Amino acid sequence: MTTIIGIKARDGVVLASDKQASMGNIVEDKRAQKIIPITDYILLAGSGTVADLQHIAKILKTELKLRELYSRRTMNVIEAANLLSHLLYQNRFYLNPLGLLIAGPINSKEFGIYSLDGIGAISEIKDYFAEGSGGVIALGTLEAEYNPDITVRDAIKLAEKALKSSIARDVFSGYGIEIYTITKKGVEKLFLEAQK
């Protein structure tokens, strides 16, 4: 399990996760990548089984690349979310439970975040969302401090605070914080150490 967070800001979006991967009650990895770049401008974050996340991310990367080659245009996050939904539904009997956030540009001025469950149901995130074993803990901080006019810069601070809260209380979250931003400037990655 884990904690992943998505925050929609007025000038972009923020995805954040902890770095711990667990196998039962054992810490399997302290540097797990739970946010995966799908394209140069679309990111996928996942809670659940890391192998399933990596598998579905590889398929999504390939399918999006093929669609971009055939159509000779860049796919937006809405198209990526719909494709991901289809892939999850096709594989619904083979994957362990997953919680996913996909983020990226809708057009040249807007950015979006979509939540998907393990069988492909999609929800557009209009403000913020937290998923995983520590998600409910992170939601308390997000609900108390989110502002609809938040900037990406402030959303980074809010994501960090919410993840630190989750890491302090959830035994399946920990060992660092990874934050990505998507703005008109592109995708940027931050890594922050956190106390366990």
From Swiss-Prot:
Propeptide: 1
Species of provenance: Nanoarchaeum equitans (strain Kin4-M)
Gene Ontology annotations of biological process type: proteasomal protein catabolic process
Compartments (UniProt record): Cytoplasm
Any one GO molecular function term: threonine-type endopeptidase activity
EC number: 3.4.25.1
Catalytic residues in the record: 2
Gene name of this polypeptide: psmB
Protein origin, superkingdom: Archaea
Documented activity regulation: The formation of the proteasomal ATPase PAN-20S proteasome complex, via the docking of the C-termini of PAN into the intersubunit pockets in the alpha-rings, triggers opening of the gate for substrate entry. Interconversion between the open-gate and close-gate conformations leads to a dynamic regulation of the 20S proteasome proteolysis activity.
Keywords: Autocatalytic cleavage, Cytoplasm, Hydrolase, Protease, Proteasome, Threonine protease, Zymogen
Function per UniProt: Component of the proteasome core, a large protease complex with broad specificity involved in protein degradation.
Family: Belongs to the peptidase T1B family.
PANTHER family: ATP-DEPENDENT PROTEASE SUBUNIT HSLV, METALLOPROTEASE TLDD
Enzyme type, top EC level: hydrolase
Cysteine-cysteine disulfides: none
Subunit annotation: The 20S proteasome core is composed of 14 alpha and 14 beta subunits that assemble into four stacked heptameric rings, resulting in a barrel-shaped structure. The two inner rings, each composed of seven catalytic beta subunits, are sandwiched by two outer rings, each composed of seven alpha subunits. The catalytic chamber with the active sites is on the inside of the barrel. Has a gated structure, the ends of the cylinder being occluded by the N-termini of the alpha-subunits. Is capped at one or both ends by the proteasome regulatory ATPase, PAN.
Chain segments annotated as coiled-coil in the UniProt record: none
Reaction(s) catalysed (UniProt annotation): Cleavage of peptide bonds with very broad specificity
Keyword Metal-binding: no
Hydrolase among keywords: yes
Full protein name: Proteasome subunit beta
Lineage: Archaea, Nanobdellota, Candidatus Nanoarchaeia, Nanoarchaeales, Nanoarchaeaceae
